[in-house]
């Protein structure tokens, strides 16, 4: 559901205790979220320490152990709603994540200097590794029955060596497969103007939901960011439930449009999957067209929207699985565990919405994550 939506009363009922009893352990919802994020940081830090200790000087081996490890204390929270924390708490969690990313980035840079790893943007790849290590609980929430246990296998395959069969070959590039832009109607086109305003609301709301979570984002917050009041949002879109459903429907329509466009290309499947990853990542991090990521807001969707998400998630899995299988058959993708890799593809960008990107770094992030899926970190 997301930390911001897990009200104290719901948690207390699940634990079989009273709500006042829960208040004896945590001051409020934000305190509970912070403590959960602290535990998650500790689990990631321990896993990273073990991986480096077991593989001194072997960054690829350390990354493999880090991604394949399981938390010792059960499922941890996924740190994906940082903006919902109070400022001091957010700064502390951000600093801890930053230190882990810095350590991974430095180790990646050392591997590049030693010639064991390929050139890459070490900061982006380090963040992607941390995101992939946290992805399994997210998939269990929204994946429509997909096997989250395959994440450790698939993420190791992708991040260590990537999908490409020929690691020396360059990959074909394409125009955006399914361009996503805010419409610019004629000034006298009333229906077009209303549609453009609705689209702009969905873009801004999606970006805020990605960064803050749905529960911590009010309609008033969205309106303030747009310079309009809550009544205008009701007029163009509807209430919060309708807004969340509309953001998710827009995202999945885009995901499926990209996939279908990729399926129709007459090009090696490795290049096609590379292009699709690049486009979806760019849309997720570009504030001008922002799409809500699959796992965000799932707990607040209507039952009809949840069913639609499950169907879309399964359709996306089937489509990308088939493209990867075709790539293996044609020889552009190496033999690999297709199901595990397909399930793991979204994990590479699961961290990205909590970052702030400039126009220059949007393209760099999209390119780096697509390259990571194709070639991994090992030297080419």
Language model regions located:
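Generic hydrophobic, amphipathic alpha-helix propensity
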Residues: 1, 11, 36-40, 44, ...
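Helix-turn-helix
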Residues: 1-31, 200, 204, 208-242, ...
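DNA major-groove recognition helix of helix-turn-helix
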Residues: 26, 37, 133, 237, ...
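Hydrophobic alpha-helical connector segments
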Residues: 35, 46-75, 125, 129, ...
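Amphipathic alpha-helical segments used for helix-helix packing
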Residues: 61-64, 68-91, 105, 284-304, ...
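Amphipathic alpha-helical packing segments from all-alpha helical-bundle domains
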Residues: 88-114, 123-127, 134, 304-330, ...
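C-terminal peripheral helix-coil segments that are non-catalytic and often amphipathic
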Residues: 102, 106-113, 138, 142-203, ...
């Amino acid at each position: 559901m997301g930390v911001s939506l897990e009200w104290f009363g719901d948690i207390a009922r699940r634990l079989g205790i009273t709500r006042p009893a829960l208040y004896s352990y945590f001051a409020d919802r934000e305190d509970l979220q912070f403590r959960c994020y602290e535990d998650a940081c500790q689990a990631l830090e321990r896993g990273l320490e073990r991986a480096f200790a077991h593989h001194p000087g072997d960054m690829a081996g350390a990354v493999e152990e880090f991604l394949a490890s399981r938390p010792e204390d059960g499922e941890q929270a996924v740190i994906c709603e940082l903006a919902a924390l109070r400022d001091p708490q957010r700064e502390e969690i951000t600093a801890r994540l930053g230190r882990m990313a810095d350590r991974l980035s430095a180790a990646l840079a050392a591997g590049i200097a030693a010639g064991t790893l390929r050139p890459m943007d070490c900061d982006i790849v380090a963040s992607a590794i941390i995101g992939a290590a946290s992805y399994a609980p997210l998939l269990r929430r929204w994946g429509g029955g997909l096997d989250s246990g395959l994440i450790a296998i698939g993420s190791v395959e992708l991040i260590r060596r990537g999908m490409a069969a020929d690691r020396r070959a360059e990959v074909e590039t394409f125009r955006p497969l399914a361009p996503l832009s805010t419409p610019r109607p004629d000034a006298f086109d009333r229906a077009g103007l209303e549609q453009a305003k609705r689209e702009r609301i969905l873009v801004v709301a999606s970006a805020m939901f990605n960064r803050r979570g749905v529960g911590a984002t009010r309609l008033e917050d969205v309106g303030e960011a747009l310079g309009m009041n809550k009544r205008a949002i009701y007029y163009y879109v509807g209430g919060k439930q309708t807004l969340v459903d509309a953001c998710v429907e827009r995202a999945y329509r885009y995901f499926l449009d990209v996939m279908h466009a990729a399926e129709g290309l007459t090009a090696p499947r490795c290049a096609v999957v590379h292009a699709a990853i690049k486009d979806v990542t760019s849309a997720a991090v570009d504030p001008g067209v922002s799409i809500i990521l699959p796992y965000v807001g799932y707990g607040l969707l209507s039952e009809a929207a949840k069913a639609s998400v499950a169907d879309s998630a399964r359709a996306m899995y089937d489509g990308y699985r088939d493209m990867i299988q075709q790539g293996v058959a044609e020889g552009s993708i190496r033999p690999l565990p297709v199901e595990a890799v397909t399930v793991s593809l979204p994990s590479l960008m699961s961290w990205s919405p909590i970052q702030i990107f400039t126009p220059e770094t949007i393209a760099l992030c999209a390119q780096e994550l697509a390259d990571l899926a194709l070639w991994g970190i090992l030297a080419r």
